Amino acid sequence: MISLRQHAFSLAAVFLALAVGVVLGSGFLSDTLLSSLRDEKRDLYTQISGLNDQKNMLNEKVSAANNFDNQLLGRIVHDVLGGTSVVVFRTPDAKDDDVAAVSKIVVQAGGTVTGTVSLTQEFVDANSTEKLRSVVNSSILPAGAQLSTKLVDQGSQAGDLLGITLLVNANPAVPNVGDAQRSTVLVALRDTGFITYQTYNRNDHLGAANAALVITGGLLPQDAGNQGVSVARFSAALAPHGSGTLLAGRDGSATGVAAVAVARADAGMAATISTVDNVDAEPGRITAILGLHDLLSGGHTGQYGVGHGATSITVPQ
């Protein structure tokens, strides 16, 4: 007969064996798990290294393509804007590099930049319609000019006024606005907070231009309000007064509520202005110049780039 002490020793031995088994088993499982994790980590590092190599290779190809474009740029745009002038408009989200690069190519193409007009945040937010209307409908309107009664929103009204003021009408029967009247309009819009501007003439006057180039940014957040619509309508309202208007945005500008996307989605605007959706890249900058040349030569509007709604990568030859 087993005594109570023997029974206690037996139970203790069983529990000790279980404890030893658990320790040994957990050690084995732990080693196996750690080994598996090490293998997975090694595989992930290998994948990351491979992806970095691919990224570097793609960056090198992009850099080579841009260098190639830079080398050929002079030949591609040679004299395509010869004897013509361009006024550059920029939105608050336009990048300095884009504005400077495209303005430089205008000159390389044989054209001149009469000046740069910067639209303020108050302008693109389009929340000051009454304030702008009071400026537009004041005595600053150049003599003999008439604003369109069909344009009632802030962006369109300003585009109409600045189109009359800053662009040489394609119809030779329409007289150009004089320097003094042009200055009156610009100063009024500047002093009321809608624009700032920079001239490139020795007499400090912003001269009349044959075409307009509107440079904007990229993707806008969904809560951007009327910014994209305002810029698109502004650009479209400029167009009837000159020989061509082109709206150029960065990567993302053809998406959502951004200006290029708005212009392309509206059949009327798309028939009035040309657009480029990759002005942050050398091919897009060259295309902007070729697009202006096409408009100045009496060609049709086009939607160029790689984004949604583009009908061609660049201007067909």
From Swiss-Prot:
GO terms for cellular component: cell outer membrane; pore complex. It comes from the Bacteria. It is found in: Cell outer membrane. Keywords: Cell outer membrane, Copper, Ion transport, Membrane, Porin, Signal, Transmembrane, Transport. GO terms for molecular function: porin activity. One of its GO terms (biological process) is monoatomic ion transport. InterPro entries: MctB. Pfam families: MctB. Residues 1-28 form the signal peptide. Belongs to the MctB (TC 1.B.50) family. Pore-forming protein, which is involved in efflux of copper across the outer membrane. Essential for copper resistance and maintenance of a low intracellular copper concentration. This is Copper transporter MctB.
